[in-house]
Amino acid sequence: PVVTQYEVRPDARIKLSRIEGLADDLAMALAARSIRIEAPIPGRDVVGIEIPNHASEMVGFRSVFEDANMVDATSDLLFALGRDVSGKPYAVDLGRMPHLLIAGATGSGKSVCVNSIVTSILMRAKPTEVRFVLVDLKRVELAPYGRIPHLLTDVIMEAQEARAALAWAVGEMEERYKKLAKSTTRNIAAYNAGPDLDPTERMPYIVLMIDELADLMIQEGRKVEEPIVKLAQKARAVGIHLVLATQRPSVNVVTGLIKANVPSRIAFAMASNVDSRTVLDQPGAEDLIGRGDMLYQPADLPRPVRIQGVFVSDAEVKAVADFWREQEPEP
């Protein structure tokens, strides 16, 4: 939608490092803003050269959400991410990630991505299946989800309350582990599938989302880093998943401990290759075009995948949130 990828099979005698060094020369020859060279494309014997299109195409949320693969999937935590360079719909499962770090400069599409995650899950899961803890220190990004039945508490807008929510999540994690031990099951899926389980004892998944991790780290520092790392290390088996978003991916915010325990990452357009290395451990995000253009680094792939993120409009967010606010609470 945003770039066209050309596949080139170089002569066997040509070193890939020589091809990678031609990016600036190719960009100048094509009068392109930036060019990304993927050498080689994982699992293939070709080099990919990605050139920005003059007219970019928006990826609608509905077109990806209604794709057959997403409709047929059973996971409550699957969300629409966007389309890859070949135009194929791309959806990912937060349950398998199991935690996600999102970083990008202002206007790069980070906030839209956060909204697409929440909206996708709201359209797939009931409040008995997935609950949210939303931390929005900017006060405007996650406010539209106020009072939906999936929330465990109101949208949190103060750093001290966020610290308390993280401490609660660590306590909840430990309680859930005790329940797993008592039922001799290894994870939340096995526990919830137990034949003798009372429906009221079912454990919902919990998604703890922090929008503007930098503000929280600046105000609370180690007091929030510790519970975040604890949750990232252990919470997967009991169905608690973190989504951390930030505009300022400095090493003070995305610390080594957080990075080591959050292997799945999304980088939108960055100001410099230093920021790109902080998030992805490699350059590349500084050459992205913006407006939803991202590099997604899954935990199980050696290189990031370039994706054009879905666009979720404010009207779509409001429609989904209003629908859930109007539902009668389940007994």
Annotated model-derived regions:
Residues 113, 117:
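Hydrophobic positions on the alpha1 helix immediately C-terminal to the Walker A/P-loop
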Residues 110:
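Conserved lysine of the Walker
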Residues 38, 103:
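Residues at the beta-strand->loop junction immediately N-terminal to the Walker
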Residues 100:
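Conserved beta-strand position immediately N-terminal to the Walker
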Residues 41, 106-107, 246:
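The conserved Walker
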Residues 7-16, 21:
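A short interface-forming secondary-structure element
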Residues 1-7:
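N-terminal anchoring/assembly modules that precede and organize ATP-driven motor systems
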